Design a protein with these regions (language model features):
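N-terminal secretory signal peptides that target proteins for export/translocation
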Residues: 1-9
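Bacterial N-terminal signal peptides
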Residues: 11-25
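A sensor for short, sequence-defined functional sites
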Residues: 29-652
């Protein structure tokens, strides 16, 4: 999110803030509720949204950047029993960037009588993104039933003295019959808006009318959410608003100017290489190779306290620990801590102090939105990384994100454009995508089958590369109990039958280059099923989550994988006495001619041991929906292979 600090004399200085843009706006809360028509009360279905559990009858969002306030009004029609869940309301917001208040709500019964909301509003954490804590005001409306209308309104206050880039999200989770939007811009900055996906059919583009930007929409289809799709907000109809100090319609000139300004700010923060030489001398040896020096500096920065990824502090802790802002890497060194961006700046300074060429690059992560240069939105460059030229090749590094292996980037910074800063405005460089073999899950199991058909034994899982990194980041602030539950739940989701699992080791949650290794005791009651004098065992023990992928025959959205990966299983199963192997499952091998996916299984036996191998490789990121049938066929082949049977019979 980009913000602008306002001074008493007028416009201030642009600064970047990482995070999501705020959901904003509505009508003045002092106004009366809108009238309710008989037609809306009697409505039982919406022909333009067949089968919908509920619809938005009306939405209004009014934002006033001159007063740092948004007003939001929402009215829904509950059409089915399933739709009653929309009586539980969540209003998301970032605590550090504003607050939600003046909440009013009511339920309109099918007979037109009113049940006002007079209950309690709660606050809960619902997500964390880039270190910013996303909270929600939550409440439950009274007497919500099929046929009723629920409506609520609230006011969002931004911090005084700041204005924020913003957006209107026109697509919602439900069909929207009618919606109105307005924005009163701050008059001392140029404001530009864009519509990345255009506008909903039948609606007109936003217009500037008497000092306000206005838009009305109607009959906007519900947004279709599907598994493995790009970030939702990237696919929704929306209007992005961006404040600029000076209007610049040419993207090339815009980014050149922005790059020069960013380079100047970075240079001031990083300082001169010679200033870092005393620190570098304590970290590296003169005889170290260039790569060894770089690795040591990387490890030195990565182990520093990273305030971006700490747990959310209480208000009391914030007041107690309040510190003046860092103005240079010297401040970061003095404190021994910094946020993710500051640590990457320190890494640049130390690498330069060691005689290496290191440049800071601004990057747009691809977990919430995709970066588009033509939109000229600096707020989309919401993170940074470091590019080091080592022996003629560029290394892309990010010690500012914990547990990132040396030579890799966090998954959401791979395969995207980055602006490598220099005094001429910078240059665009694509960040690398790691090879498919760099991120793996390797499962190894030694199991015994008893005469009742239950499997017991030991399972070892090695999470490698990005598969380890994202898990370590996700669990960084959790205790031992939650981490154990996290790993055990991952196993349970991959086995179709009820599995009893117990973690038996202490995984290394603080590592980065090393795999995350978890060891378990495992029991699967009744894995073998009896039919007559034979027993049947499904060969694909750990493939349940893959087998459930892309079950639907139709697809609306593109397919999106976070990063390329490989999964491999190596299972040795000991058969019980008195049982012989009647037949092994068929071997399977399926692969795309372009090597973007492959699947292979094999089975063999020796004496009373059965050896099963399984390999799955996904080497793609973004796939158009038109290729869904081919990809679905592949996963159906995976399902077929995993459902192959081992057949056992009584020994003579």
């Amino acid at each position: 999110m980009r913000s602008v600090k306002l001074s008493a004399r007028g416009p201030g200085i642009l600064s970047l803030l990482a995070g999501l843009n705020l959901l904003c706006s509505n009508q003045a809360l002092s106004a009366d509720w809108l009238p309710v028509t008989t037609e809306d009360l009697q409505m039982t279905r919406e022909p333009k949204a067949p089968g919908a559990p509920a619809i938005y009858l009306y939405r209004q969002e009014d934002r006033d950047d001159t007063e740092s306030v948004d007003n939001v009004y929402v009215r829904l029609k509950i059409l089915t029993e399933e739709g009653r869940k929309y009586g539980d309301v969540e209003i998301p917001y970032f605590k550090d960037l504003g607050n939600v208040g003046s909440i009013e709500a009511r339920t309109i019964r099918p007979d037109g009588s009113i049940a006002p909301f007079d209950g309690k509003v709660y606050e809960k954490a619902i997500a964390a993104a880039h270190g910013a804590k996303l909270l929600a005001k939550t409440f439950t409306l009274p007497e919500v039933q099929s046929g009723c209308i629920v409506e609520y309104r609230y006011r969002y206050h931004s911090p005084p003295g700041w204005i924020f880039d913003s957006r209107w999200l026109l697509s919602q989770d439900l069909f929207t019959r009618y919606a109105k939007y307005s924005l009163t811009p701050y008059p001392y900055f140029s404001l530009r808006w864009s519509l990345p996906l255009g506008i909903p059919p039948g609606s007109n583009a936003p217009l500037l009318d008497h000092g306000k930007i206005r838009l009305e929409t109607h009959d906007v289809p519900a947004f279709v959410s599907e598994e493995l799709m790009p970030p939702e907000n990237e696919l929704k109809y929306r209007v992005d608003f961006i404040y600029m100090g000076k209007a610049q319609p040419d993207p090339v000139k815009f980014w050149k100017s922005f790059g020069q300004k960013s380079f100047h700010e970075m240079s001031q923060f990083v300082g001169y290489p010679k200033d870092m030489e005393p620190v570098v001398a304590k970290v590296v040896q003169p005889t170290d190779s260039a790569e060894t020096k770089l690795r040591k500096i990387y490890a030195y920065v990565a182990q520093m306290r990273n305030t971006t990824y700490e747990r959310q502090k209480t208000e009391e802790e914030v007041k107690r620990d309040r510190q003046s802002p860092d103005h240079s890497v010297k401040d970061v060194l003095k404190r021994g801590s910094g946020d993710a961006s500051e640590l990457n700046n320190l890494f640049v300074a130390l690498a330069r102090g060691a005689g290496l060429r290191a440049d800071l690059a601004l990057v747009g992560t691809r977990d919430e939105y995709f970066f588009h240069r033509q939109l000229m939105n600096p707020g989309q460059l919401n993170a940074n990384l470091v590019i080091v030229n080592l022996d003629g090749r560029n290394l892309f590094l990010n010690p500012g994100v914990p547990f990132t292996p040396f030579g890799m980037l966090p998954w959401n910074e791979t395969a995207v454009d980055s602006l490598r800063l220099d005094d001429d405005g910078g240059s665009w460089v694509s960040t690398p995508l790691p090879p498919v073999s760099a991120s793996r899950i390797e499962r190894s199991a030694q199991l015994k089958l008893d005469r009742n058909g239950s499997l017991t034994g030991k399972l070892t899982i090695r999470y490698i590369g990005l598969e380890a990194a994202w898990r370590r980041v996700a669990e960084r602030n959790e205790d031992e109990t939650n981490r154990r539950q996290f790993l055990e739940d991952g196993i349970k989701s991959s086995v179709s039958a009820g599995v009893q699992i117990k973690l038996t080791n202490s995984p290394d949650w603080r590592g980065s280059d090393e795999p995350l290794v978890a060891e378990f005791e495992l029991e699967i009651p009744g894995w073998a099923t009896a039919a007559g004098h034979k027993q049947f065992l499904k060969a694909g023990l750990f493939g349940s989550s893959d087998d459930r992928t892309f079950e639907g025959s139709m697809r609306t959205q593109p397919i999106y994988f976070d990063f390329p990966y490989q999964h491999s299983d190596d299972i040795v199963m000991e058969l019980p006495a008195g049982v012989k192997l009647a037949s092994l499952p068929k071997n399977h091998k399926v692969a795309a001619s372009t090597a973007v996916y492959s699947y292979e299984t094999s089975a063999d036996a020796h004496d009373n041991l059965v050896h099963l191998s399984r390999y799955l490789s996904i080497n793609m990121l973004l796939v158009e929906a038109k290729y869904y049938p081919e990809l679905r066929n592949f996963y159906q082949s995976v399902r077929t292979g995993d459902e192959e049977q081992i057949v056992l019979a009584a020994a003579p």
